[in-house]
Amino acid sequence: MNDGSNSDATATSSAAQRQVRVQLTSKQEDIALPDNTGPILVPTSLRRYALSTLVNKLLGNDKPIPFEFLINGTFLRTSIDEYLTANGISAETTLEIEYVRALIPPLHIASFQHDDWVSSTDVLSATSPAATWASATISQGQEKILSGSYDGLLRVWNMSSQIVATSPAAADGGHTASIKAAKFVTPNQIASAGLDRTVRLWKYAESDEGFSGTIAPQLELYGHKSGINSLAVHALSNRILSASSDNSVGFWSTKKSDAPAAPDDLLPSAASRSSKRRKLNSSVTVPQRGPLALLSSHTAPVSAAIFDAKDSTVGYSASWDHSMRTWDLVTSALVDTRTTSHSLLSLEHLPELNLLAAGTSARHITLIDPRASATTISAMTLRGHTNAVVSLARDPHSTYGLISGSHDGTCRIWDIRATKTDKDGAVGESVYSISRKSLEEQGRSDTKRVGGEGVKVFSVCWDKTVGIVSAGEDKRIQINRGEGVLSA
């Protein structure tokens, strides 16, 4: 007489042996299977590791590559069978599975200590925009890191954490207040801006051996009536965008000959006459110019202004007034306004996806489709930070990658394919969180502080050669690197 145990075993065996057809694809040519690779019948019990082994076998790799797998834009974190059950998908269908190189944790490489908070950072490397625009060759090991600090000084560092050059103090033509933004325009030119309301251009020169250099004042740009929060540069068109607390976006030329005269009432000489203060930069004469245009429409401080990554005649701005605005930089006309539910503090363009990422005061990142045809304001929300998101940079390795810097003391890496749907629509979660090394060195095991106290991140830059460079309240530049953190 059968006691039922055999039928139970048969059911278990049947579940284990259930199969599904999968079509394995990759968008990366160097790891893609041949076009004629058809659907493959695999057990639904397979998980990531077994699938990774299968793909390596199909590719004939001598040295296995760890892979991650995406189904309908979501990373596979269970068995295929569990995924099918959770999503109500029949095993009779052919499952499209995209594989990408597995994520590699971005390891700490170095930290550069400053005397004051570090507000901004940028990179000069063979793959950075400044070098690419200038068709310049930056040899391996000759990369430079630019930092702007609350002490009002710019510093250029080499990869051995040595200071190569420092900008002059206020009395010698430098900033007269804290710097909030700094960018390499070309390998020989730097732009900066800050609380002294000016945008400044500098000539950067290195000695032949590259161990020392100079940052010399080149041009002072006046037009804003309050502090400047961020800068964007586009060397090919010799243009700069600035975002100011006076509610306006500044549009400037990097060339003295193209720029109009500076407004008399905003020049230091006018301030000296009205307040009888000592003229701080009297020892140096630097050309002074005004803006090509001041774009006024925002009703609160502008936190960020950027160029469209594919069309430099288009600009975008984000503001404390909750809005993201699109500008025609040829005519200075406002083209479009997208209003969100929160103050916007940072902005980055993801051109291949037709999306703008905006960091908010509400601790999340909103992905906005700026195209006029878009029917919804927010295409996706990225959640995970515990304080304001004040800096964003796209992943140079991947169409889908983004990094954010937050006042919670962390940088988070996002793959916007890793999403789920809830009552608020599509929601993404970060794939990595980078803490401040300074906390580890203080012996704090949790490497976190409530609200990011003392370790707020103010700026983050992601360079294909150097890695992830972040700056913050801990008075440090921090470099982290993980080869191919995400996949294209």
From Swiss-Prot:
GO biological process entries: chromosome organization; maturation of 5.8S rRNA from tricistronic rRNA transcript (SSU-rRNA, 5.8S rRNA, LSU-rRNA); maturation of LSU-rRNA from tricistronic rRNA transcript (SSU-rRNA, 5.8S rRNA, LSU-rRNA); protein-RNA complex remodeling; ribosomal large subunit biogenesis
SMART domains membership: WD40
InterPro entries per UniProt: G-protein_beta_WD-40_rep (IPR020472), NLE (IPR012972), WD40/YVTN_repeat-like_dom_sf (IPR015943), WD40_repeat_CS (IPR019775), WD40_repeat_dom_sf (IPR036322), WD40_rpt (IPR001680), WDR12/Ytm1 (IPR028599)
Hydrolase listed as a keyword: no
Gene Ontology CC annotations of this record: nucleoplasm; PeBoW complex; preribosome, large subunit precursor
Any one Gene Ontology molecular-function term assigned to this protein's record: ribonucleoprotein complex binding
Keywords: Nucleus, Repeat, Ribosome biogenesis, rRNA processing, WD repeat
Protein family per UniProt: Belongs to the WD repeat WDR12/YTM1 family.
SUBUNIT field: Component of the NOP7 complex, composed of erb1, nop7 and ytm1. The complex is held together by erb1, which interacts with nop7 via its N-terminal domain and with ytm1 via a high-affinity interaction between the seven-bladed beta-propeller domains of the 2 proteins. The NOP7 complex associates with the 66S pre-ribosome. Interacts (via UBL domain) with mdn1 (via VWFA/MIDAS domain).
Protein name (record): Ribosome biogenesis protein ytm1
Species the sequence originates in: Aspergillus fumigatus (strain ATCC MYA-4609 / CBS 101355 / FGSC A1100 / Af293) (Neosartorya fumigata)
